[in-house]
A protein has these predicted regions:
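N-terminal and secondary-structure boundary signal
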Residues: 1-328
Length: 328
Protein backbone atom coordinates (compact mmCIF):
# COMPACT_ATOMS: atom_id res chain seq x y z
CA UNK A 1 0.00 0.00 0.00
CA UNK A 2 1.28 3.47 -0.84
CA UNK A 3 1.16 6.38 1.56
CA UNK A 4 2.91 6.91 4.88
CA UNK A 5 3.90 4.65 7.76
CA UNK A 6 1.75 4.81 10.88
CA UNK A 7 3.38 3.28 13.94
CA UNK A 8 1.17 1.44 16.42
CA UNK A 9 2.30 1.36 20.06
CA UNK A 10 0.53 -0.41 22.90
CA UNK A 11 2.26 1.43 25.76
CA UNK A 12 4.54 4.33 26.65
CA UNK A 13 7.70 2.45 25.70
CA UNK A 14 6.18 1.79 22.30
CA UNK A 15 5.50 5.52 21.90
CA UNK A 16 9.15 6.22 22.64
CA UNK A 17 10.19 3.68 20.00
CA UNK A 18 7.77 5.13 17.45
CA UNK A 19 9.11 8.64 18.07
CA UNK A 20 12.68 7.39 17.68
CA UNK A 21 11.65 6.10 14.24
CA UNK A 22 10.15 9.46 13.27
CA UNK A 23 13.38 11.33 12.40
CA UNK A 24 12.97 14.00 15.05
CA UNK A 25 16.56 15.13 14.41
CA UNK A 26 15.11 17.45 11.78
CA UNK A 27 13.61 19.45 14.67
CA UNK A 28 17.08 20.28 16.04
CA UNK A 29 17.53 23.94 16.92
CA UNK A 30 13.88 24.79 16.22
CA UNK A 31 10.97 25.88 18.37
CA UNK A 32 8.49 22.99 18.33
CA UNK A 33 4.91 23.62 19.47
CA UNK A 34 3.20 20.48 20.73
CA UNK A 35 -0.46 21.12 19.90
CA UNK A 36 -2.84 19.40 22.30
CA UNK A 37 -6.10 19.90 24.20
CA UNK A 38 -5.38 20.20 27.93
CA UNK A 39 -8.90 19.44 29.06
CA UNK A 40 -12.26 21.06 29.77
CA UNK A 41 -13.23 21.44 33.45
CA UNK A 42 -15.39 18.46 34.36
CA UNK A 43 -14.13 16.21 31.54
CA UNK A 44 -11.75 13.51 32.87
CA UNK A 45 -10.61 12.12 29.52
CA UNK A 46 -7.96 14.61 28.41
CA UNK A 47 -4.44 13.59 27.35
CA UNK A 48 -2.22 12.44 30.23
CA UNK A 49 0.55 14.92 31.15
CA UNK A 50 2.86 11.89 31.32
CA UNK A 51 2.28 11.24 27.60
CA UNK A 52 3.02 14.87 26.82
CA UNK A 53 6.28 14.58 28.77
CA UNK A 54 7.37 11.58 26.68
CA UNK A 55 7.00 13.69 23.55
CA UNK A 56 8.70 16.70 25.13
CA UNK A 57 11.65 14.52 26.13
CA UNK A 58 11.94 13.02 22.64
CA UNK A 59 11.95 16.46 21.02
CA UNK A 60 14.53 17.74 23.50
CA UNK A 61 16.73 14.69 22.95
CA UNK A 62 16.62 15.46 19.23
CA UNK A 63 17.81 19.03 19.86
CA UNK A 64 14.46 20.77 19.51
CA UNK A 65 12.90 23.36 21.81
CA UNK A 66 9.37 22.14 22.62
CA UNK A 67 6.48 23.92 24.30
CA UNK A 68 2.92 22.73 24.90
CA UNK A 69 0.38 24.80 23.02
CA UNK A 70 -3.34 25.31 22.67
CA UNK A 71 -5.70 28.19 21.87
CA UNK A 72 -8.52 29.79 23.80
CA UNK A 73 -12.04 28.62 22.98
CA UNK A 74 -14.87 30.61 21.40
CA UNK A 75 -17.61 29.60 23.85
CA UNK A 76 -18.01 31.09 27.36
CA UNK A 77 -16.06 29.52 30.19
CA UNK A 78 -12.72 29.38 31.93
CA UNK A 79 -10.82 28.41 28.78
CA UNK A 80 -12.15 31.39 26.81
CA UNK A 81 -9.22 33.56 27.90
CA UNK A 82 -5.52 32.89 28.37
CA UNK A 83 -5.27 33.22 32.15
CA UNK A 84 -8.30 31.01 32.68
CA UNK A 85 -6.97 28.29 30.40
CA UNK A 86 -3.58 28.49 32.13
CA UNK A 87 -5.35 27.76 35.42
CA UNK A 88 -7.18 24.80 33.88
CA UNK A 89 -3.94 23.42 32.43
CA UNK A 90 -2.26 23.76 35.83
CA UNK A 91 -5.09 21.93 37.61
CA UNK A 92 -4.92 19.15 35.03
CA UNK A 93 -1.21 18.63 35.63
CA UNK A 94 0.28 20.49 32.69
CA UNK A 95 3.07 22.46 34.38
CA UNK A 96 6.67 23.11 33.45
CA UNK A 97 7.82 20.80 36.25
CA UNK A 98 5.52 17.94 35.20
CA UNK A 99 5.98 18.04 31.42
CA UNK A 100 9.46 19.54 31.12
CA UNK A 101 8.66 22.63 29.04
CA UNK A 102 6.63 25.82 28.99
CA UNK A 103 2.86 25.77 28.53
CA UNK A 104 1.61 28.46 26.13
CA UNK A 105 -1.99 29.50 25.44
CA UNK A 106 -2.55 31.43 22.22
CA UNK A 107 -5.11 34.17 21.61
CA UNK A 108 -3.86 35.90 18.46
CA UNK A 109 -3.54 34.71 14.88
CA UNK A 110 -2.19 35.41 11.41
CA UNK A 111 -4.59 35.57 8.49
CA UNK A 112 -4.03 33.03 5.72
CA UNK A 113 -6.13 31.77 2.82
CA UNK A 114 -6.71 28.06 2.28
CA UNK A 115 -9.07 26.77 -0.42
CA UNK A 116 -10.30 30.35 -0.92
CA UNK A 117 -11.29 30.65 2.74
CA UNK A 118 -9.63 33.24 5.00
CA UNK A 119 -8.73 31.97 8.46
CA UNK A 120 -6.56 33.15 11.34
CA UNK A 121 -4.00 30.49 12.24
CA UNK A 122 -2.64 30.80 15.78
CA UNK A 123 0.49 32.94 15.67
CA UNK A 124 2.65 30.34 17.42
CA UNK A 125 1.70 27.67 14.87
CA UNK A 126 2.01 29.99 11.89
CA UNK A 127 5.54 31.02 12.91
CA UNK A 128 6.72 27.45 13.50
CA UNK A 129 8.56 25.44 10.86
CA UNK A 130 7.58 22.18 12.55
CA UNK A 131 5.25 20.87 15.23
CA UNK A 132 3.90 17.81 16.99
CA UNK A 133 0.12 17.33 17.03
CA UNK A 134 -0.95 15.26 20.04
CA UNK A 135 -4.61 14.27 19.81
CA UNK A 136 -7.08 12.33 21.94
CA UNK A 137 -9.41 10.32 19.71
CA UNK A 138 -13.09 10.45 20.73
CA UNK A 139 -16.56 11.03 19.35
CA UNK A 140 -17.96 14.41 18.31
CA UNK A 141 -21.64 15.18 17.93
CA UNK A 142 -21.18 17.45 14.88
CA UNK A 143 -18.04 16.07 13.20
CA UNK A 144 -18.56 12.37 13.94
CA UNK A 145 -15.24 12.07 15.73
CA UNK A 146 -12.23 14.11 16.72
CA UNK A 147 -8.62 13.24 15.97
CA UNK A 148 -5.68 15.07 14.43
CA UNK A 149 -7.74 16.94 11.82
CA UNK A 150 -10.22 18.15 14.44
CA UNK A 151 -7.42 19.07 16.87
CA UNK A 152 -5.85 21.34 14.26
CA UNK A 153 -8.96 22.49 12.43
CA UNK A 154 -10.69 23.81 15.53
CA UNK A 155 -7.84 24.11 18.02
CA UNK A 156 -5.24 25.69 15.76
CA UNK A 157 -7.10 28.89 14.93
CA UNK A 158 -8.43 32.00 16.68
CA UNK A 159 -11.85 32.49 18.24
CA UNK A 160 -13.18 34.23 15.15
CA UNK A 161 -11.99 31.42 12.90
CA UNK A 162 -13.40 28.78 15.25
CA UNK A 163 -16.80 30.40 14.80
CA UNK A 164 -16.32 30.55 11.06
CA UNK A 165 -15.41 26.87 10.83
CA UNK A 166 -18.54 25.98 12.79
CA UNK A 167 -20.71 28.09 10.50
CA UNK A 168 -18.64 27.87 7.32
CA UNK A 169 -20.03 29.85 4.41
CA UNK A 170 -18.43 31.45 1.37
CA UNK A 171 -20.02 34.13 -0.85
CA UNK A 172 -20.42 33.05 -4.47
CA UNK A 173 -20.85 35.50 -7.36
CA UNK A 174 -22.81 34.99 -10.60
CA UNK A 175 -21.30 37.30 -13.22
CA UNK A 176 -24.18 36.63 -15.61
CA UNK A 177 -26.68 38.28 -13.28
CA UNK A 178 -24.48 40.95 -11.69
CA UNK A 179 -25.05 44.57 -12.79
CA UNK A 180 -21.95 45.92 -11.02
CA UNK A 181 -24.19 48.22 -8.98
CA UNK A 182 -21.72 48.24 -6.09
CA UNK A 183 -24.19 47.57 -3.29
CA UNK A 184 -22.19 44.55 -2.16
CA UNK A 185 -18.99 46.62 -2.11
CA UNK A 186 -20.63 49.26 0.08
CA UNK A 187 -22.09 46.64 2.43
CA UNK A 188 -18.84 44.75 3.00
CA UNK A 189 -17.35 45.75 6.40
CA UNK A 190 -14.02 44.10 5.57
CA UNK A 191 -13.46 45.93 2.26
CA UNK A 192 -13.03 42.57 0.56
CA UNK A 193 -14.97 43.44 -2.62
CA UNK A 194 -14.25 45.70 -5.59
CA UNK A 195 -15.80 46.36 -9.02
CA UNK A 196 -13.33 48.81 -10.57
CA UNK A 197 -11.87 46.13 -12.85
CA UNK A 198 -14.78 43.72 -12.78
CA UNK A 199 -16.23 42.07 -9.69
CA UNK A 200 -13.48 40.75 -7.45
CA UNK A 201 -13.22 39.35 -3.94
CA UNK A 202 -10.15 39.29 -1.71
CA UNK A 203 -10.52 35.99 0.14
CA UNK A 204 -7.85 37.09 2.61
CA UNK A 205 -10.17 39.85 3.84
CA UNK A 206 -13.54 38.09 3.59
CA UNK A 207 -15.06 37.22 6.98
CA UNK A 208 -18.02 35.27 5.59
CA UNK A 209 -20.47 37.61 7.34
CA UNK A 210 -23.03 37.54 4.52
CA UNK A 211 -23.75 41.26 4.32
CA UNK A 212 -22.90 41.28 0.61
CA UNK A 213 -25.48 38.56 -0.03
CA UNK A 214 -28.12 40.48 1.91
CA UNK A 215 -27.36 43.72 0.07
CA UNK A 216 -27.53 42.21 -3.43
CA UNK A 217 -30.83 43.00 -5.18
CA UNK A 218 -30.28 40.98 -8.37
CA UNK A 219 -29.61 37.54 -6.92
CA UNK A 220 -26.01 37.60 -8.15
CA UNK A 221 -24.71 36.85 -4.65
CA UNK A 222 -25.44 33.71 -2.67
CA UNK A 223 -23.88 31.63 0.07
CA UNK A 224 -22.17 28.31 -0.51
CA UNK A 225 -22.54 26.69 2.91
CA UNK A 226 -19.88 24.11 3.75
CA UNK A 227 -20.13 21.17 6.11
CA UNK A 228 -18.25 21.27 9.40
CA UNK A 229 -16.15 18.35 8.14
CA UNK A 230 -14.91 20.33 5.16
CA UNK A 231 -14.38 23.41 7.30
CA UNK A 232 -12.23 21.39 9.71
CA UNK A 233 -10.18 19.96 6.86
CA UNK A 234 -9.59 23.39 5.32
CA UNK A 235 -8.65 24.88 8.68
CA UNK A 236 -6.32 21.98 9.51
CA UNK A 237 -4.59 22.34 6.15
CA UNK A 238 -4.14 26.06 6.79
CA UNK A 239 -2.34 25.21 10.05
CA UNK A 240 0.12 22.73 8.54
CA UNK A 241 0.73 24.09 5.05
CA UNK A 242 4.50 23.87 4.27
CA UNK A 243 5.29 22.58 7.77
CA UNK A 244 7.06 19.49 9.06
CA UNK A 245 4.63 17.70 11.37
CA UNK A 246 4.62 14.56 13.52
CA UNK A 247 1.24 13.31 14.73
CA UNK A 248 0.50 11.28 17.85
CA UNK A 249 -3.04 9.95 18.40
CA UNK A 250 -4.06 8.49 21.75
CA UNK A 251 -6.70 5.76 21.49
CA UNK A 252 -7.39 5.67 25.22
CA UNK A 253 -10.53 6.76 27.06
CA UNK A 254 -12.41 6.79 23.75
CA UNK A 255 -15.46 8.69 24.90
CA UNK A 256 -18.82 9.30 23.27
CA UNK A 257 -18.31 13.06 23.04
CA UNK A 258 -15.65 15.72 22.60
CA UNK A 259 -12.94 16.85 25.03
CA UNK A 260 -14.67 20.26 25.11
CA UNK A 261 -17.80 18.72 26.64
CA UNK A 262 -17.82 18.78 30.47
CA UNK A 263 -20.13 15.74 30.29
CA UNK A 264 -18.54 13.60 27.55
CA UNK A 265 -20.69 10.52 28.05
CA UNK A 266 -19.43 7.00 28.47
CA UNK A 267 -16.50 5.10 27.03
CA UNK A 268 -17.58 3.59 23.69
CA UNK A 269 -14.54 1.47 22.85
CA UNK A 270 -11.85 -0.33 24.87
CA UNK A 271 -8.40 1.25 25.08
CA UNK A 272 -6.31 0.33 22.03
CA UNK A 273 -2.98 2.14 22.20
CA UNK A 274 -1.20 4.97 20.43
CA UNK A 275 -0.44 5.89 16.84
CA UNK A 276 2.47 7.97 15.52
CA UNK A 277 2.63 9.18 11.92
CA UNK A 278 3.44 11.97 9.49
CA UNK A 279 0.04 12.65 7.88
CA UNK A 280 -3.13 13.80 9.65
CA UNK A 281 -5.49 12.01 7.26
CA UNK A 282 -3.51 8.76 7.52
CA UNK A 283 -3.32 8.72 11.31
CA UNK A 284 -7.02 9.56 11.63
CA UNK A 285 -7.92 6.85 9.10
CA UNK A 286 -5.79 4.34 11.01
CA UNK A 287 -7.46 5.40 14.26
CA UNK A 288 -10.93 4.77 12.84
CA UNK A 289 -9.86 1.45 11.33
CA UNK A 290 -8.57 0.20 14.69
CA UNK A 291 -11.65 1.43 16.54
CA UNK A 292 -13.94 -0.21 13.97
CA UNK A 293 -12.29 -3.56 14.74
CA UNK A 294 -13.33 -3.23 18.39
CA UNK A 295 -16.61 -1.33 18.03
CA UNK A 296 -17.77 -1.25 14.39
CA UNK A 297 -19.13 2.14 13.26
CA UNK A 298 -19.51 3.26 16.87
CA UNK A 299 -19.15 6.96 16.09
CA UNK A 300 -21.57 6.83 13.16
CA UNK A 301 -24.10 4.94 15.28
CA UNK A 302 -23.81 7.39 18.17
CA UNK A 303 -23.83 10.66 16.21
CA UNK A 304 -25.41 9.90 12.84
CA UNK A 305 -22.43 11.70 11.27
CA UNK A 306 -19.92 9.92 9.03
CA UNK A 307 -16.57 10.37 10.84
CA UNK A 308 -14.64 9.72 7.63
CA UNK A 309 -16.09 12.74 5.82
CA UNK A 310 -13.44 15.05 7.25
CA UNK A 311 -10.74 12.64 6.05
CA UNK A 312 -12.14 12.62 2.52
CA UNK A 313 -12.12 16.43 2.44
CA UNK A 314 -8.56 16.46 3.79
CA UNK A 315 -7.47 14.17 0.96
CA UNK A 316 -9.07 16.51 -1.57
CA UNK A 317 -6.90 19.28 -0.14
CA UNK A 318 -3.66 17.32 -0.46
CA UNK A 319 -3.36 14.99 2.53
CA UNK A 320 -3.02 11.24 2.00
CA UNK A 321 -5.12 8.75 3.98
CA UNK A 322 -3.26 5.70 2.65
CA UNK A 323 -0.96 4.11 5.23
CA UNK A 324 0.96 1.03 6.28
CA UNK A 325 0.57 0.05 9.94
CA UNK A 326 3.78 -0.94 11.73
CA UNK A 327 3.62 -2.17 15.33
CA UNK A 328 6.54 -1.19 17.56
Amino acid sequence: MSGSTVYFARDDDGVRSALSNSSLARFAGKAVPIKLHMGEPGNPYFIRPELARIIVTAVKDAGGHPFLFDTVVAYPGERSHRHGYERVAYRHGFTRDSVGCNVTIGERGVRVVEAEVALEVATQLHEADCMVVLSHVKGHVQAGFGGAIKNLGMGGVTKASKRRVHFMSVPVHDAGICTNCGLCVTACPSHALSIEHGWRIDRRKCEGCGKCVTACQTGAMRFDVMSLARGLAISAMACIRNKDVVYVNSLHNIAENCDCDPSPGGIVCPDIGYLVGSDAAAIDAASLDLIDREAPDVFLRNTGVDPREQIRHAVELGMDCQYSLCEV
